[in-house]
């Protein structure tokens, strides 16, 4: 029996306290933008019936065939840890009646699960912020959603990401394209690898995603879905592009962009970067006008996207973005009875709700407490001894700058701390 402590499961990572501030910064910025566009939060379960994903994502996709965490519960029902958020959001919208006679704008956040090979930017438990809008078929909404994602990336200071667009048309135009694509690939089948040959029989559009250079050469000359678009889808895509250009959002049309989920129709988009190696997609989305009906609801047009938080945080970390929260602003050194320390800490929080103040606990002399204050990362130590308590004052010791040490009446100490935190 090993005497090693229990380790986390491969591909499931802890987000440690020193990492959390950057996550909080990213999540807060994204939430602010979503709310400014009228989106409301919905909180969804991480466990759903397996049928939900096989019906929505597609039974012959890599996700359903190879990547889902699926098991039978004690009742013998097949259940799955969610690999993405859209299907659950649609299910909740149908079940609750949210989609009936309404045009809800919803957002959600949380962990998703896929049994993939862990690598940089790809974990088996990963986190997304997603958003969906239901009931609006017009291309203006496609453009607004893409413009909103551009605003999110600007708010986070990310400039080296590129927008790629494509249109997948309707199921009918995809069927016409599939016929042409299969005929082309049959002529070049000897140049396809085993995975591409398998997809040729099940889901040939996914061969555009191949990372094999030889297969990529074959696909470079393959029939393009865009050339098979029906006139309504083509006009829809033209309007989206024109609106993005009017808004100053730069993009490139990528005919090979097909997305990994079967439910997409018409507009699809991705924000990509070269700074994350092979896992360069930071945000992706598109229309799914048939999914609500497919899952048992009324015919309802819809569009959505998801942002990958691990990849977003990696970009922020790489460019040196400071996080939100983190270390305390002040560390309260208590050189008098503990009750007075508790009262002082609460009084400071009442006066300055934005102040992060950590009170010393666990015993130790004055010097030991100051060492703990320094190690905490706090900018100042607040010293409360018998003299300070009697005088209604605090001694403030600057731990990071050149202000030295000064005793101030409590009101003046609050003013000093207000300036310290910019409140």
Curated annotation (Swiss-Prot):
Top-level class of the enzyme under EC nomenclature: ligase
GO biological process: histidyl-tRNA aminoacylation
Gene3D superfamilies: Anticodon-binding domain, Bira Bifunctional Protein, Domain 2
Lyase is among the record's keywords: no
Disulfide cross-links: none
GO (cellular component) term, any one: cytoplasm
Name of the featured protein: Histidine--tRNA ligase
Coiled-coil features, chain-numbered ranges: none
GO molecular function: ATP binding; histidine-tRNA ligase activity
Record note on quaternary structure: Homodimer.
HAMAP family the UniProt entry points to: His_tRNA_synth (MF_00127)
NCBIfam families linked: hisS
InterPro entries: aa-tRNA-synth_II, aa-tRNA-synth_II/BPL/LPL, Anticodon-bd, Anticodon-bd_dom_sf, His-tRNA-ligase, HisRS-like_core, HisRS/HisZ, HisRS_anticodon
Catalysis: reaction(s): tRNA(His) + L-histidine + ATP = L-histidyl-tRNA(His) + AMP + diphosphate + H(+)
Primary location group: cytoplasm
Family: Belongs to the class-II aminoacyl-tRNA synthetase family.
Compartments, record wording: Cytoplasm
EC number: 6.1.1.21
Gene: hisS
Species the sequence originates in: Halorhodospira halophila (strain DSM 244 / SL1)
Keywords: Aminoacyl-tRNA synthetase, ATP-binding, Cytoplasm, Ligase, Nucleotide-binding, Protein biosynthesis
Key word Chaperone present: no
